[in-house]
């Protein structure tokens, strides 16, 4: 498990990513001009899917707020995020 508190990033390709079975818990996060602030996915078949839980965040000027594969979970401010229409295309960006 990884816990992140009081993090910020400006002008970045990606923000916080959970992959291959990692569990990431973040709070008090600010991103500006981060293309993909949040992501969760399974890259290697021998590992599990990612879990990313973020509370109290602000993201501005992003391409897409999050990407995830079908089985990974992204929870932003207590709301479980569903796959968005650009997921498959955008996942290749963070691989």
List the model feature ranges, each with a label:
Residues 1-95:
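Extracellular beta-rich repeat passengers
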